[in-house]
């Protein structure tokens, strides 16, 4: 879906920016979409 593509684009860009940090982080985990967290955030916003 278009929403899923948009989320992936955001996550990919976010992770690319984090990888480009100088000096590099020693223990920086990649961000990924969490559907449950997204649903909770949407309920709060509604």
UniProtKB/Swiss-Prot annotation:
Its main location: secreted. Disulfide bonds: none annotated. The keyword Secreted applies. Expressed by the venom gland. GO terms for molecular function: calcium channel regulator activity; toxin activity. Keywords: Calcium channel impairing toxin, Disulfide bond, Ion channel impairing toxin, Neurotoxin, Secreted, Toxin. It comes from the Eukaryota. Blocks contraction of smooth muscle elicited by high potassium-induced depolarization, but does not block caffeine-stimulated contraction. May target voltage-gated calcium channels on smooth muscle. This is Cysteine-rich venom protein asurin-1. It comes from Austrelaps superbus (Lowland copperhead snake).
